[in-house]
């Protein structure tokens, strides 16, 4: 009798505990309950709506290894310090034309999957998974990869972005519903890539029916007016890049990069689709008009002179800095190679140079440590071979901090500047960036021309790349024996 008397109380307490646990989980995910649904139910809903569902992958794209294996023609100006991931997809139902890039020769488990892919105008790609662990920057961005030019009778790489990326300041996740401020790292998200409004709506309906909150669903538009969609050899190919930079916990970052992320579906509708093409999306506007960084020009000139004074016994060659890449829409119109550009940064570069293994021949890279100003997410430089565009080494804002104070010990502006030595042999000095000669694309041979590329990422106020002319350009001096 006593046990029966306490049973309702026990059940009530159990129910209350369960409710509190659910509420707590919902609060941690951004308030309003779990936003993630059931993938199996989502797939069933898609198939009930007539879609053919094929599974792909989101995993690492090792540019240097791909080049060394002869699978790609260059390294595309890769950011030496920031890894890449990409979708790897099967061909569409009925597609008979191969795509152009697959890593299956070095990863046999990826046989039948392609890093670039052709798409029908009514198809979609869906990613369901977690954002990366805490880092300085991440994004997801669609590109036109290869375009056929009938006047030339050949296909050429364009590698131009198709709009603004979904980045860590704009993406909708459980921690940042609808892109609001919050905890964006290690959060559930959904990304739909498609060119068609109707298909986007049908995919969202299937997601909703499977329990997914629209607060975490993002549509990354492929603008059909700028591309040629279809499955034939003369149609464009596409690629999605997932960029990541400078993990707070390096081991967590390595674990993320080493594993296949989330679930990727290629969705192909059955029957005839009445197309409802998206317009070209608006771009976020670069620049705020804040030119405070330009006030550091005097201090930068003092740093320049201090560097020359320190190495006054050597010959100094000033290497000019210029704008390296513009944006994907420029490349699409002009038929030039944008090298996988990203609207969230600016790209600057130095003149070409060669660097011998003479200990008296080296570079001093210097400039404003742009992130120290407080406007940007990160900045870095990379060293490239000019022939194959292989980024092999570099430095970023955290390790550059304080490096100018050696030259300007009494100037308070030195905290906003940097100076870094680059040489063939560092002699074990961690403050010197070493340029190896190989093996393969992991180095730059002594007789091959090289250059420096500079990036400044993601202005916090605009959530896009900086405006070039609000910056003081990074600089480099080559020193060599007299």
Predicted feature residues:
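Bacterial N-terminal signal peptides that target proteins for export
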Residues: 1-11
